[in-house]
Structures are given as structure tokens and as C-alpha cells.
């Protein structure tokens, strides 16, 4: 047993039914009456740490081998506890340092006498993939001597720069609370999420890692602005220009106190202290790819999901949805998927469809993808299962619900349908229960989803803790209060702790289930099994949404979806192998539009690149100008979806009859997305689950210090630069806005136009910085192709669905001059069929369908002669024939007379082509 609890715990017994451990409870936790209300409690460490009288003194240094050392240290002070009597001070610690690869190092701090919650080393969770243990590595480690206080200093060997330093920093390791500080050598730190930052580069403040249902949260340095996910990693740029990633492998509640450019303090409530350090080079991608591999990378989403999505809370009937579908089609707006919020459910209950409002025939007409107009459908699913529903009874039969430590029965929370039970996704039958429920949408109602949107999965709860069966829920908008809910009426060991993450305004036990709720913890558990340990919500909370994502992924595969598409609100480091993400409830305000790029940058760093923000904003009424600008940039989010609340005005692109520029801009922007769709998607395919796709500009130009704080433009891969308008026009009557150009200090870019090929586009460099570009409300945002790179596009003006795009392409070649020749390079994929089956068979894992393209041009009289080299990424690259119907060239000192040349790509080899020059350019 881990905790020496001052309160009697529930008696837990295992009743074996087949191979499943069924856990029951013999009595409630406390003998106190359930109407006892305790006085307010302030955790003793809430306003800062309490100094220790002693330190952890090294007793033994055990050199296991050249790349593994153990440090044993003992606390030499008089204290037996820290901050409060029940929080035992851990007096004997073991620090294990292992270098498992030339650029990867692990630090694990454990106690030698008490058992803490430890994230398993299973395929579900982050774990090492490489075990080279090289004696010749990139790390220079300074350790204390015997008799000295414990510390660590880790440097990059070739530059001598410090990457991890705890010397002279406060450190405490106790039963319920750890505090650990790392010195920062400069201010260039990114990551630490999930959160919605005012800027991509971090400012000083307190930042919380706790999966929480928190509406329109914006991180401002106060600890109460947590959001839906936990990613305790950061990317730091060293003074030499090299990058590294540090990850804290802990999924308990954490609060980080950052002093800009000075230090980062981790305040950790439970679990272990385990750090992983990944040394990269001067490209941020290098260290991030190492990190992504460690957290198991990201799975590929289906091609159709890369199209545009339309959603709102407020599509109350299938007739409303078909009207949206019809109007999109009539206006020539490309889109692939229509979504349903909770409106489609009967009585807001999971696994049901209200057939009085959602007509099967209407829905299936819309979802008939055997005809050109058919689309996909993605409905929302919440975590709570309504009491009294047939699905709830099925869950009770299987015994899969979360138990209450206070009543011994299924824990009762409150969400949209009222009283609910939550599945314990650690239970071995939970995945089958969940799959059965999701499949009932087809089995019982004859309507088949293509993916799922899993929401409220932190788990969210409209009350704090739980209620008993004879109590009523307080729902949003209710003015009554009930202080006697079980979650806050009796003392709970797990809510009266030394430090509470989130601060006084939004404490960690707010809006979720009781932290003392027991989790299934037998050998057949689905997510976590910790032998001889009392596994509770206290430790498992941040894993709820992760575990539901695994179950939903399993369900979709069981339904025949080879590449599951799941948009999950809650996520952790490692969720990308199962789900995708949207950034949650935002506001229809210019600020939220500006924040959105940084949010998506973060999730590309976290390893969940298929992420987007609610386009035009979720809450409050949008405006025509804001929606037009948001559609311009949102059309290029990895996950692109317009979504708003039921109490706001319609904001579909066509919903502004007095401001037709919204429709015009949306149509142009979405058609450009679809023209680029296969090129954009190819970045996800060829990445093989690691690296970023939608990234800040400095990722491609890391030596340009002026870009390190620029979060108002983006790169898609290596080749496309977007400079959206993110501010309101000062002169809206002109229906345009003047933006200042900002380009990297090296390289050059060209205006990028598709649909109508434009020759001799304008070239831009940093010499153009500060110049003004006028961007109209009805236009596409400024988009540029990078000199030295290629981009494949398609004529997408008539293809309103991704599956209608053919295998004919135009090749844009932005040539960089090198001596007397011109060069460009790129990457693409070689398939015609973008179905799940073909992608899996030809492109994923050990399979490969990516090729590199290298273009070299030489002026030859009246032409620019091009040599195009095609090389598959591996000897086994699968080629399907694709057609290039036109080459569109760009070059700084050449003027082209036409864009010509037609060829096919079907194998490795060399292709020759010529582009005619204008007469004045001919030699």
C-alpha cells in the first residue's frame, strides 16, 4: 500500500468472473454523514514552498556500466513529513541516469521505500525504442561526490552548453508532492501544454498540466488557465542555435513555474520524476522527431478527413443538415464532412438518435458516397452514459462503470442528459462495451458514422465530485446550489493535499469526478496495471480521455475503418497514435484567431499534427470580416472545420448575404486547399508518424533570430509560407486591409496562385520587409512558394469532394539559381488510390509510396531545359502512375513565355522537359 491514510479506505475484493476481475465494495469510505460540510481548506504549499532543514546527500555512486549510473541519496534533515503530517517525506531516493542512444538520456528519480504511481513501459505509453547505450555520446554529465548534496548538470559535449542543470536549486521528494527546478540558460522555450497562449514564446508565469473542461481559457501566467491536455515537454533553442527537447514522463497533475530565461520549477502532485532529454541539431525537427518516436508518433488520418468539415451545435434536425449540404453544393463550396453536435441524440443520450428529428432516409441520401455529392458524417459522443438508458443498463451488466469510493456503487456525475455513469476505461470489458454502443448507431438506427468526435472526456462533470441517487444535478443555467454533494461534503484524502494544481479559482477537483474514485487494477486492465497499488482517479485523471481514445479507435476498426478518424478534446503525450484534436471552445474574437496558429504549432510539437481551431469562433456572434479572415487561414489548418454554438448566429460561409465577400473568399480559399490537398496530405504520409507539418517559420529558418517570436505566419512543410491577416481592418469600408510583409533573412519566395496558372510571379525576399500588401476581404490569404522547392497542385474548381480529385497534377517549380543552373527539390507520393486500404498496403509502416523529386534547369537558347530526377525513398517504393499536365516555373532572373510539358511519374528515373523563354531572355 502506498499511502498511510488517516481515513479508513474501502475494502476492495476481487471476484473472478472468467478472466475479468470484478471489483466490489463492502462499505462506504467514511462513517461521517453525507451532509457534513467541511470548512474551506487551503493547501499549505499554495503560496510557495516551505524550506527544508536538510538536503538529499549522496551516499553511493554506482557505475553500472559506461552509460548507466545510479545515485543513492538520503535526506539528512529532521523532518518526517513535508507541509502537512500525512505527506511523508521520502528520505531515501534513487536517481538512475541512462544514456540509451547517442543523443537520448533518461533521468529517473524514485523512492526506495514507498511505491508511487508509475506510468507503465508498455506500447501504449512513451518508451525507448533504441538501446544502443553508446559510450561515445553527446552528453557531458557532472555529478556530485559522496557526501555532497544531490544535483545534476548535463551539457552538450561538443559545445559545452548546459541543457539540464539542477545545481543550487530547491528539491523535495515526498509522498504526495515533488518539487524540482531546472535552470534555464535563455528565454527561447516552447511547448509546455496544452494551453492557448497569447504568444508562442513563453512568458514568465505559472502553467498547469491538468486535463480540464475550461471554457475559452487563455494562458496569461496564472495557474487557473489550464485546458484539455497534458504535454509536459519543452523545446529550447540553445545559444549556439542547437535545439533540444526535455520531457517529464509523468501524467499526474503538474504546475510549472517559469521565470523567463532563468528557471523552470515543476510542482508535481503524485507519480515519479522521470525526465527524457533529446539532443538535436540546428533544426528543431531533429529533436522533435526523436521525441515523437519516444511518445509513439502519430497515426495517419484518412484522406477524406483532410478535406473541409462543417459543424455547429444547433443542427437540430436532419432537414437542417441537408439544407446545409444542399447550400454548400449549390454554392460550389468544397467539403467532405458534416458533423452533429449533441442535437442528434435522443434526450442528449449517447448511442442514440432522435428519429423524430433525424430522418434516416434524409441522412442516408446525404451520406450516399456512391454519388458525387455524398459526404461523411461525424457525430459527437460524450463520456457520460445517462442513467436509465438501455446502454446504461448494458454497462451495468458488464460492470464497466467507474465506482464510487463513498457509496461502493457506480459513481454518479452530471452532464448534458442529467445523471450519468462514466465508463472506467481501464476495465477489460470497457472497449467492447464502448464499441457496441457506437455500433448501435448503425445497428439500431441505420445511419453509419465515418468517425467520432469524443468530447467532455477529461472527464467533464457539471458538479464537483459526485452525487447520490436521491440528489439532483445542477445543470448549466441553474441558479440553485447544493453544497451537500458527495464530492465536497466529506473529507477526501485526495482533495486535501499539500498543493492543489490550478489555483483557488479553478482547483484541480473542479468539474470532474471525485479524486478518490477507485480504478480497475488487475492484470487484465486495458490501460494501466500497477500491482499492489490503490489506483485512483487521483493518478488516472489525465488518462481518462487517452483511454477513451483507445477504445474509440478500437471501435472504428471493428466497424471497418482501417484509418480511424477521431477528434478528441482530451489528450496527453502519446495520444497522437490513436486520435486527432481540435483546440476546444474558443471565442468569435480577433484574439482567438491570432492565438490559433500558436495552438496548432504546439500540437505539431506534441506529436498530434492533425489539429485545428474552430473556424470563425465557437462562442459569441462572429462578424463577416472576422469570419472571412478566419476562413482564409482556417482553410489551411491541418484539421479544417467551421463550428459554432447553438446560441450564436449562423456562420457557414454562405450565411452572410449582406457581406458576400465571406462566401467569395471561402470559395477561393477552400478550392485552393483542395488544389493542394494531395500535396498537403503527402506531408503526413511521408513523415511516417514523426515531425511537424504546420509549423512556425523559424523551424525552416532557425538561424533567423527575428523569427523566434513570430507566431503570425506559418509554413506547410518546407515549401509553402502563409501570411494571413489576423487583425481587424482600420478601414472596413474599403473591404481590405494593409499588411506589412515579413520574410526570412535568407531565401526567397514567390506569390503562389493555382486554378489559373500565373507565370512570372513576383519574387520576395527580406528586402521587401516592411512593405505593405493590400489583402481584400474576398481574397485568398497571401501564400508563397519557397525558392528551391516544388509543389504539386490540381485543378480543383469542379472537385467538391476529396475523392473526386483525379491523378492529374500541375508541378510548380520555384527555381533557385546556383551558378549557371537552376535547382528545386521536393517530395510527393506516388499513388492514385487514396483509400485506407491502399494507403496501408502501399504507404504506411514498412511500406513506402514517397518519392523525392530533384529538378535542374539550364538555359539553352530559347528554352530552359529541365532535368527531373525521380527517386523513390526506398528500394521498395510503390509507384502508381500520376500525370503532370503542366510545369509552372518560377525564377528570379528569367521570364517565361509559357508553362508547358506533359509527363508521367511511374518509376525511378530521369525526365527531360523544356520551358520556352520570352524573347528577351533567349541566349
UniProtKB/Swiss-Prot annotation:
Glycans are attached at residues 65, 405, 440, 586, 621, 646, 848, 908, 912. It catalyses: Hydrolysis of terminal, non-reducing (1->4)-linked alpha-D-glucose residues with release of alpha-D-glucose. The keyword Secreted applies. It comes from Tetrahymena pyriformis. GO terms for cellular component: extracellular region; lysosome. Essential for the degradation of glycogen to glucose in lysosomes. Has both alpha-1,4 and alpha-1,6-glucosidase activity. Optimum pH is 4.0. It comes from the Eukaryota. It is found in: Lysosome; Secreted. The keyword Ribonucleoprotein does not apply. Gene3D superfamilies: Glycosidases, glycosyl hydrolase (family 31), Golgi alpha-mannosidase II. InterPro entries: Gal_mutarotase_sf_dom, Glyco_hydro_31_AS, Glyco_hydro_31_C, Glyco_hydro_31_CS, Glyco_hydro_31_TIM, Glyco_hydro_b, Glycoside_hydrolase_SF. This is Lysosomal acid alpha-glucosidase. Its main location: other. Its EC number is 3.2.1.20. GO terms for molecular function: alpha-1,4-glucosidase activity; carbohydrate binding.
